[in-house]
């Protein structure tokens, strides 16, 4: 049985939890995307499981995660975390 995995971008991989939390908060993602970011980036919950929690399609989560990753990476860089 295959299990879904969370793949963090290299630039976010080495961040401490507190840095990740700060980058997510400072990225101003909005309520839903902030929740998705926390579940995906901090809790390491696979996209399919996040989709089930929200009652959305996995593809919707996938599109949002791409945007979230871009914003969080950019914010982490501005905060000199990366």
Task: Tell where the protein language model's regions lie, with residue ranges.
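General nucleic-acid-binding
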Residues: 1-11
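Short alpha-helical "recognition helix" segments of helix-turn-helix
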Residues: 49-54
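Short helix-to-turn junction characteristic of helix-turn-helix DNA-binding domains
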Residues: 28, 39-44
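Short, Lys/Arg-enriched N-terminal segment that forms or immediately precedes the first helix
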Residues: 9-26
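Short helix-coil-helix linker/hinge
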Residues: 26-33
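Short alpha-helical "packing" element that flanks the helix-turn-helix/winged-helix DNA-binding module
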Residues: 35-37
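DNA-recognition helix of helix-turn-helix
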Residues: 55-78
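Basic, Lys/Arg-enriched C-terminal extension of HTH/homeodomain DNA-binding domains
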Residues: 82
